[in-house]
Amino acid sequence: MRLLLTIVLMFVAFVLSSPKEGPDMQLVQPYTVDSLGACQGISYQKGKLFLYGDREVGMIREFKMQGDSLQYIGHEMKLTLNDTDVINHPTGIAYNGKDPVFIGNSIRLNKEGTLWRAVIYCVNWEGLQKTGTLDGNLLNTIDDDTCIQGTRPEYVQYNKKWYVATADYGDKKNEVRLYDPAVLKNAKKTSEKGVLYKKFTCTPWVQNLYWLADKGQLLLIQNQMEGRRWRFTYVDLAKSIASGQQEVIKVIDIDRADELEGFTFLNNYDKGFAVSSSRRNNVNAISVHW
């Protein structure tokens, strides 16, 4: 009996001391945020939350935390140039506070979704926030011709250097690719020499990316099927680059039937917001436990 008790105690101690593989995520509270069109993503920057969507033109709205929800502060940016809609379907804002800022645009060219044009825009982010349009703030337009289906830029760090990661949405030959921002900012297309640094294969339906810098993990924000249901896939970036395929830490499926579009953590990795393209309940507080 004493031996059995000792074994049980040792097992419990082992379980408690073992590192947990990835977090648990739980939907806490849905909110409805209007005037976004179909929300395409969310970016958290120095206490500010930027939600972007495809209303009558591509646009970005700034919010702040108000208790556990978001409050619109009355600041909107239209992604237009000379009153013409340029970034009509924004899909990702690559921002790290020191390198050039890039915004993605994924354009469906046919109803079947087999033909896409993906464009990455290098922008003056501070100027865009001040003036509210791309006039005078569009620095370069880059054709992401290396992509397979769409582009969704996000900064990641690998071997102490920053890269712009992006991924495909479709169900064939999906990849995560890392671009050199110093070369990308002056390029006309991503197939130019020196732009693409590394790549690895990944699972389908990636809507957006999020970099967990302190953990060395890249979060793939996905649908479980085309345009439907929520999936979060945590991958080890360094191992994925080394092997050439995603090295999964954990996959989390949340029981929501609509189209997950984006996600961001807040200051710590214990709380975040997920956004969907729905007209109602399109912004959702998420609790995260590691």
Describe the function of each predicted region:
Residues P30-M59:
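Beta-strand-rich domains and repeat architectures in extracellular enzymes and scaffolds
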Residues P30-S35, L81-D85, T141-I148, Y197-T203, ...:
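Surface loop/turn motifs at the tips and blade-to-blade linkers of beta-strand repeat domains
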Residues A38-Q45, V86-F102, C147-W162, Q207-D214, ...:
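Structural signature of eukaryotic scaffold interfaces centered on beta-propeller domains
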Residues K48-L79, G127, T131, W230:
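Beta-propeller domains
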Residues V57-K64, N110-N124, K172-P181, E226-L237, ...:
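Structural motif
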Residues S69-I107:
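Blade-loop segments of beta-propeller domains
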Residues K199-A242:
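Loop/turn-rich, solvent-exposed surfaces of beta-rich toroidal or solenoidal domains
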Residues S243-N267:
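Conserved blade-ending motifs and adjacent loop-strand segments that build the rim/top face
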